[in-house]
Amino acid sequence: MESVLHCNTKDTLKLLGDDKWEALGDEVIIIPKFTTEQPVDCIRGKFGPFRAHSAAKVPLWAALQMEHLQQCTIELPYWLREEELKKMRDDEKANPNIFVKVPRHYTEIAFALLGLPRVFGGDEKQRSRTVLLLRELIELRRDKIVEGLKSFDSSPTELNVSHMSAA
């Protein structure tokens, strides 16, 4: 039996801001539940071929659609694992004057994945801990932005910000 992936992107662009739209193009790893010899042809490109139970990289939008159709499971990116989030949070705390480098579109990708019931295999406690760590990281970064803006006098001459990425 051949699986068919239907992609509906009709109204997606007008529902999303630029950052979310761009994040949907970032690649994630999936574990397909089907095998196909030919690549799957979608509006934004071809993906595959897929082998059941073998990891494959696809754009986030395709992974979300396939997961919705229960055709795959999405692997959490390494940086969304509890230990890595703790490290990023602790690094952010330890460096009050700089923004620690974080993955591009980390907030958009994280909240897209955290909204899926099967991402943590039904472990709601792990999901809750991950959400808490992510929010702590975001708050630390936003606090740095606010403090930085407060420190400006009335005539700033230069603004140099690195690794701010959606705070």
What is each residue range found by the language model?
Residues 1-45:
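N-terminal, Lys/Arg-enriched amphipathic/low-complexity engagement segments
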Residues 2-20, 80-167:
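Charge/polar-rich, low-complexity and marginally structured segments
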Residues 21, 35-87:
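Compact, well-ordered interaction domains used in eukaryotic information-processing assemblies
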Residues 22-30, 72-74, 92-96:
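Phosphate-binding glycine-rich loops and adjacent basic patches that engage nucleotide phosphates
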